[in-house]
Amino acid sequence: MTKRVLVKFSGEALAGKEGYGIDTKILKFIASEIKALVDAGMEVAIVVGGGNIIRGVSAAADGIIKRTSGDYMGMLATVINGVAIQEALEHIGLEARLQSAIDMHEIGEAFIIRRARRHLEKGRVVIFAGGTGNPYFTTDTAATLRASEIEAELLIKATKVDGVYDKDPNKFDDAVKLDTLTYEQALTKDIKVMDDTSIALARENSLPIVVCNMFEEGNLLAIMKGDMSLCSIVK
């Protein structure tokens, strides 16, 4: 059974049906899914996006806001989401620590890898916010980077679909689920698992990536116990 895992949630997933902001019902659901992992003896880290609040690329689309500033705005959005997830985890009795790549001492700790590992060893959930701390990098890349740094055995990308498909299953009825694919296939066949930087970094560090449906209760724990029928895996 996998011991240490990093779970990546998109910011959009927190928004629920409204499409923006934070749905506390989804926060509660995420917290309960993470608690199941912790209760099973696993060490859990989280990275969350910020798309429910603002996306850097979109903010900079018309040229008024520079891309670098737009990306920093997106990083701040991930901190907001990180605080929300921390509150939800603590509400159900878990210990959680927020570490930000952008210093915000009043809100969370600075990102320090040794401290993050120590938190995990003590059974605390660590939420990594602020992306990588640099513009032009996605939160998917941040998730792969942090997972590599904490020496996670698995990176789970929790999405709205149950895996990776050869084309968009929401648009094409004949879309085929790909249960297993290599890093090279993900890169060369333009299959949208994560961006190329994320995939390349995962390949370099031999970090398996699992893509699954975050809205199915019990999915995360079942996958961590070895049920790969619920997901797609890139390795």
From Swiss-Prot:
Pathway: Pyrimidine metabolism; CTP biosynthesis via de novo pathway; UDP from UMP (UMPK route): step 1/1. GO terms for molecular function: ATP binding; UMP kinase activity. It comes from the Bacteria. Pfam families: AA_kinase. It is found in: Cytoplasm. GO terms for biological process: 'de novo' CTP biosynthetic process; UDP biosynthetic process. ATP binds at residues 8-11, 51, 55, 159, 165, 168. It catalyses: UMP + ATP = UDP + ADP. One of its GO terms (cellular component) is cytosol. Keywords: Allosteric enzyme, ATP-binding, Cytoplasm, Kinase, Nucleotide-binding, Pyrimidine biosynthesis, Transferase. Allosterically activated by GTP. Inhibited by UTP. Catalyzes the reversible phosphorylation of UMP to UDP. Homohexamer. Belongs to the UMP kinase family. This is Uridylate kinase. The gene is pyrH.
